[in-house]
Amino acid sequence: MMKVIWFSSLICFVIQCSGDSGPIICAGPIHSNKSADIPHLLGYSEKICQIDRLIHVSSWLRNHSQFQGYVGQRGGRSQVSYYPAENSYSRWSGLLSPCDADWLGMLVVKKAKGSDMIVPGPSYKGKVFFERPTFDGYVGWGCGSGKSRTESGELCSSDSGTSSGLLPSDRVLWIGDVACQPMTPIPEETFLELKSFSQSEFPDICKIDGIVFNQCEGESLPQPFDVAWMDVGHSHKIIMREHKTKWVQESSSKDFVCYKEGTGPCSESEEKTCKTSGSCRGDMQFCKVAGCEHGEEASEAKCRCSLVHKPGEVVVSYGGMRVRPKCYGFSRMMATLEVNQPEQRLGQCTGCHLECINGGVRLITLTSELKSATVCASHFCSSATSGKKSTEIQFHSGSLVGKTAIHVKGALVDGTEFTFEGSCMFPDGCDAVDCTFCREFLKNPQCYPAKKWLFIIIVILLGYAGLMLLTNVLKAIGIWGSWVIAPVKLMFAIIKKLMRTVSCLMRKLMDRGRQVIHEEIGENREGNQDDVRIEMARPRRVRHWMYSPVILTILAIGLAESCDEMVHADSKLVSCRQGSGNMKECVTTGRALLPAVNPGQEACLHFTAPGSPDSKCLKIKVKRINLKCKKSSSYFVPDARSRCTSVRRCRWAGDCQSGCPPHFTSNSFSDDWAGKMDRAGLGFSGCSDGCGGAACGCFNAAPSCIFWRKWVENPHGIIWKVSPCAAWVPSAVIELTMPSGEVRTFHPMSGIPTQVFKGVSVTYLGSDMEVSGLTDLCEIEELKSKKLALAPCNQAGMGVVGKVGEIQCSSEESARTIKKDGCIWNADLVGIELRVDDAVCYSKITSVEAVANYSAIPTTIGGLRFERSHDSQGKISGSPLDITAIRGSFSVNYRGLRLSLSEITATCTGEVTNVSGCYSCMTGAKVSIKLHSSKNSTAHVRCKGDETAFSVLEGVHSYTVSLSFDHAVVDEQCQLNCGGHESQVTLKGNLIFLDVPKFVDGSYMQTYHSTVPTGANIPSPTDWLNALFGNGLSRWILGVIGVLLGGLALFFMIMSLFKLGTKQVFRSRTKLA
């Protein structure tokens, strides 16, 4: 049967043969000399073309919508009819290219079992109408009894018909194309090597069509998987990701098509005669194979046979090996993917506990070894990696005093993440100083009532002894000097004498008389007397005891330095009305600027109302101060892998007509790639000349065409969110306590106000902190595992090679599929190297995984410790390893803040029971106050240098508050206002000076505010004088004089006793002698 179909400017000949099936030929119309041009979207051809075995017929039809013809293909555009009739489908494979149904004889096709689709569906019975390649074979499909295949070939409908004409859930799902050919067998060793390389390309696939591909601990449900493959005649197919193909031309009888000009295809018998008897005309290649008839007989009466412009036999290059497979294709299979077991998330650590040690803690984990841990005490933190069940973690030396809350966050080797809290009582006050005559002893003499006087006496005695030794040494040096200088003086005297003698002789020649001689003799005698006086001169004795009082007096004079401390602000913008009972209901509006305090401290905004003895406080307690990334535009980075493929076509075969087609551009796709890659993906195409001639498997000696394409893909779907940091700004974690007692935690970043809570909004104003090396850092987060890293990256829109962000996508979905309309890249990231038959690629892409592993959080960069943050303002927080100060304050805006104030004055009395801690330090001194109050109220303590406010409960209770002092000995009267009741309390106690905390390996601290005392001041001489003699200039003067005189008297007493002892010893020796 023969049909001729006209369409637009193309004419298509479709032949059905009883035996061998002929190809589809697309040629220009016979009535026109103009060649038919097909727009080069998938390929470029002219004059004579073939929709060959790997042409993706449906793709060709999709890009040539003007075509209205008959094609032996089960799918395609809706307006396409199908040929031959449906009752002949058993002979036509929609999977294989049209007119090559004889290839079915090369394959073993088994009947479908239990399902007629790749996805679950009903079981079909009846005739098979197309096949589907599976991982280990080929399966035929059909419609169930009482059903027939629809014209489109994609649905089965009931023969009796329904209202819709279709049956639900009967859609046949199939995607793919296959080319089959005679195979060159390969040994089992080569097959195993190909299999191993395939497994390395698909490490996350567990099973394919129910057959084990990789061993997995956990796997997903089966899901569609589109993949290129080749059948090499062994137990299963080899699936491939990155491979190359080349086509070699080997002519046979079915590679030629015979037709009569002006009529159409020759009949089967005529074509068979042409190919066997050589009685027809043909092109050079046909004549070489079958022979041709020569003569002037009209061309219309004879068949003309021409070589079909097809790619030839395919050779696949994969894993460094070249194979001529039985079948090569691209189709959909069902695969299960590896599913990793979810990691154990944050929880409690069974068998974990803390032990407090000097300067740190010991963390014990009984169930598993410790992998890593971060322990924070106050605003000092320390991190450690152990691998043991008992780990000692040290903080900054000398940083912790008194009762301190401990926060632990860590992970065990078995994967368990944990967090828990505890507390330690570190030595406080003078108990923290446990050495004698050491550095701490010199800074805190008040802690040594007896030892300090002993130390002073020893110092004075050593001072006097040193001065005596010094004067004696100077005296000895003077005597030694006179011995050395005497010969020099004698030499100068002799020289002087000789010069005078010469002068006298000159004068004798000029003067006459004995008078001149006598005068010269007299002058010489006077000179001799002067010389004698010079020689007899002796240095005066120096009284060494005069220097000690002078030096000690200079050392004792100094000035004390003071530091700013925590203060509170009072607001008078209050309007009140009488409430129920003895309460006033007040509403206040305003703004206040509070000094920012250090972690663990509070800043208070104190509210009072006229006529009410009561007061309320709004408190801001700082829990942490860190540096946070102020993000600029974020983008998404895929875990990209470079891919490339190439196909070599001989000259005048397929798309390679007269060389590389001019319409093949960077966005073009070869016909061989049509189903193997996403047309919307990010890539770059090209065409280059390859080898030609018989040595390269081509009929034509002209250079062949190597169509190549390089692209990137995300095989594992891993996506990284990259957030470049425009700046690193201070960020605080604060606990806001309202006057009503309600508490809310906020995470304000510098300059960004918090949400309004009960009419109150807080803005943290922290100064920028300049740290070198942080400007190019970016937060890098893997969206699935939540892995965090901090590393240099490209800014959004920039693609500098060598940094994270060479490929940037605008959304998570576009990064998963790497779409060209949602991602940008530099095509030079994937290099391509052309060879004789194919092209190979190499990657310059920076591995985000490798960078993230190297710079994983926690990490230390530029003197800062970066760790994971769990608040909304940034994923990562930075803390200085050593003391680093910033300036900051809190701007509090309150509008309509409600206060309930009592009009009854409380009866409140108390006393200070203890004063301990440190002075000129970050934590301040701890003052214990015992109060008795007749009702709940607010107490306000005001001392000379500091003040604080705290809540008081009804009854007798003890309270501990922080106050800052700048001297060691505290003895002063402070004002106590408790519920309107005024009284005085006396503070007495000794405070210690804590040295500036020193960095310990693994420790770091949160940023603190420089407006709060930091411990950077050293004790002045006045601190010593206060510790020794008490406060007051008169006490200092009398004390210093008394010490000097007492030391002098003690010194003479000791010297007298020493001389007396020496005399007694001398007398005893004399008597014995």
From Swiss-Prot:
Residues 475-535, 1058-1073 are cytoplasmic. The record marks K1071 as: Important for glycoprotein C and glycoprotein N subcellular location. Residues 536-562 are annotated as: Internal signal sequence for glycoprotein C. GO terms for cellular component: host cell endoplasmic reticulum membrane; host cell Golgi membrane; membrane; virion membrane. The chain crosses the membrane at residues 454-474, 1037-1057. Residues 20-453, 563-1036 are lumenal. Residues 475-521 are annotated as: Golgi retention signal. The record marks S562, C563 as: Cleavage. Residues 1-19 form the signal peptide. Residues 650-656, 691-705 are annotated as: Fusion loop. Glycans are attached at N33, N63, N853, N914, N936. GO terms for biological process: entry receptor-mediated virion attachment to host cell; fusion of virus membrane with host endosome membrane; symbiont entry into host cell. Disulfide bonds join C26-C49, C143-C156, C180-C327, C206-C216, C258-C305, C266-C303, C274-C280, C287-C292, C349-C352, C356-C424, C376-C381, C563-C604, C576-C586, C629-C725, C644-C841, C650-C698, C656-C705, C660-C687, C691-C696, C778-C793, C809-C823, C908-C978, C918-C921, C943-C974. It comes from the Viruses. Pfam families: Phlebo_G2_C, Phlebovirus_G1, Phlebovirus_G2. Keywords: Disulfide bond, Fusion of virus membrane with host endosomal membrane, Fusion of virus membrane with host membrane, Glycoprotein, Host endoplasmic reticulum, Host Golgi apparatus, Host membrane, Host-virus interaction, Lipoprotein, Membrane, Palmitate, Signal, Transmembrane, Transmembrane helix, Viral attachment to host cell, Viral attachment to host entry receptor, Viral penetration into host cytoplasm, Virion, Virus entry into host cell. Belongs to the phlebovirus envelope glycoprotein family. This is Envelopment polyprotein. It comes from Dabie bandavirus (Severe fever with thrombocytopenia virus).
